[in-house]
């Protein structure tokens, strides 16, 4: 199971009601951050998320509301004597922007900070998950991300085991490790005695973007699409590099992702006003507040939890 935690759901600037963008994904004992707007450290304290559990941070682009929370996060990690390296991933220019941040004050981190500039073709593989990057359209180098939980093996099939003349026992753990073993003179393969694989969750985060086909393509068969919907309607739009609620809903329908989350709300709207208008346009959408959580069991059940 993974858990998606919304640390900041607004865009552009904080309001008394919500902070700027940051999303945490919890898998096992690890926390992965996507965007770190100013004030994210305080949001983490409220959500009871330890900075020490963060191994990787993914930045969509370098507008302030998406990355200015990094200095406070890094300095707190150092204050707590962190030794493990921190990996930060982002688009073209990441190394320069982050080095400038680290040089802006009397501060030296207690751990290595490894910056990875990635492109829209990057596919990063880790122990329990993968992260894919794709290019979006925001007027500056900008990425969206796919978080893909690795598929799990199917359950042991007792009927198949007995058909091989075997009984359940300790050998099953050895088979899990080795994938193929010899038992009682028989070669047994893990795939022969287990059911179909359980598909892992697929969470897609658009970052800031105007409508673009890449989001649709990378969201196909997704479990959850988190798409920016800065403006309620076309009349409110201030620029051409953001998305309206109606546009985000159309993108979701084309992608056939299971669930849609509308994110990065303009500070001009109260939560109540935005939610009412959003649900009148796209009744199936999830509109989270800061600190709301979504639990996902594989590619199946999606449980939205109000804080």
From Swiss-Prot:
CDD domains: RNaseZ_ZiPD-like_MBL-fold. SMART domains: Lactamase_B. Zn(2+) 1 binds at residues 61, 63, 138, 208. Keywords: Endonuclease, Hydrolase, Metal-binding, Nuclease, tRNA processing, Zinc. It comes from the Archaea. Binds 2 Zn(2+) ions. The keyword Metal-binding applies. InterPro entries: Metallo-B-lactamas, RibonucZ/Hydroxyglut_hydro, RNase_Z/BN. Zn(2+) 2 binds at residues 65-66, 208, 264. The active site is at 65 (proton acceptor). One of its GO terms (molecular function) is 3'-tRNA processing endoribonuclease activity. It is an enzyme of class 3 (hydrolase). Its cofactor is Zn(2+). It catalyses: Endonucleolytic cleavage of RNA, removing extra 3' nucleotides from tRNA precursor, generating 3' termini of tRNAs. A 3'-hydroxy group is left at the tRNA terminus and a 5'-phosphoryl group is left at the trailer molecule. Its EC number is 3.1.26.11. Homodimer. Belongs to the RNase Z family. Zinc phosphodiesterase, which displays some tRNA 3'-processing endonuclease activity. Probably involved in tRNA maturation, by removing a 3'-trailer from precursor tRNA. This is Ribonuclease Z. The lineage of its organism: Archaea, Methanobacteriati, Methanobacteriota, Thermococci, Thermococcales. The gene is rnz.
